[in-house]
Amino acid sequence: MAALALFVMTAWSVGAVDTTITADTLTYNGNEDTAQAKGNVVITRGTAKMTGTEGLYRFADQSATLSGGVSYVDGATSLTAATVTAYADQSLAASGGVEMHADDRTLRGATITYRPSDGYGTIDGNAYLAVPGTEMTAGHVEAYVNEIRMIGTGGVSLSHPEQAFAATADAITYTQTPGADDGFAVLTGNAHAVQNGNTLNGPALEVRLKEQAVETKGRSTLVIRGGQ
């Protein structure tokens, strides 16, 4: 018991930063080189902090998995989920009602992976991604949220209320310069776009939101709202 108590109270070095695990019960498995934590688990690594009800730390790859109402916070990044795995490079894999905030970006889905070093993330299962002024929903979203570049596939919708723009397609790629209102969307497969009440349908559309300019690809239909 004395050795276990010392283990609970002591931080150990992991690469360039220290990792500390605190819990009601900690068990070290020398054969598997893991530490299992149960009850009011708190894991800190550098500036990051995770809390949950049960956790497992793997010394081999320096990864930590927490489950049970998990909360993760690191600076301007926060995440809640049923289960979260944090890796040595600070990347995250979360599942179960995941909601994440990174600065002014919001991500939601059944599962989310995120890499803070370059802002790359994936969202699966009722995927939702919001960046300033624009929202995307899809079955799957792949994005670089720092530079605002996202690709949605599977029943995708995109909206920009300030530009009175809404669209749906099988796949949508959207890019925007951070801090600028220069959104550009490429819609492919059953593309449908509405801006200021005017509707365009076609196999593919390219939309520059601020200029309210649309280029069609293939045979398309434009429906102009009455009075315009």
Regions found by a protein language model. Name each.
Residues 1-228:
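Mature-chain termini and adjacent capping regions
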